[in-house]
Amino acid sequence: VLIACATLDVHRVLLIGGGATQVTGPYTKVMDLLKTGLLADYGITHIDIAGHPEGNPDDPDPEQSLIAKLNWADTHGMHSRILTQWSFDAPAVNSWIERLRALGFKQPVHVGIPGPATLKALLRYATVCGVKTSSQVLKRQGLSLGRLLLINKPDRLISDLRGYDQLHLFPFGGLARTTEWLKQR
């Protein structure tokens, strides 16, 4: 993959890890790859690192893991930004960003949010992705059959978010539906 990145003049990569029940390569964590120096050897100068405002079932301390990666990037002259797991819980995301900023981290934060989707689809993805708080928020909206089939749009969530640099959309309701919603904004 790194040879292809160098050949194609790719300088930015998104680094995510975990979730696999069986490791298939030499690296069990993103930090293992970072420590090799291979990214810089192949021309990678910018890294996007996953952030988990609601925690991560595969990491007992995801905030410390993120901080370690950000510090590593700074120490090694690598540009970094944070792309978060999707969330439906604006207060949790806002508090998480505030904690990072209070610790002195200034990297751009791209907050992951779901595009328009049914409550049923959002609950399914919340379970798969381990997004606990968002799952609880969605369940509080009511689980009647009619409610499960309504399309939920992220407009209110967006208006409640603070301190982020950009949004990163997860098109759980389909790419066409998300694209149409974006055109109407």
Locate each region found by the language model:
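A generic, well-ordered mixed alpha/beta core segment in the N-terminal half of proteins
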Residues: 1-21
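C-terminal helical cap(s) of enzyme catalytic domains, especially alpha/beta-barrels
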Residues: 93-94, 175-185
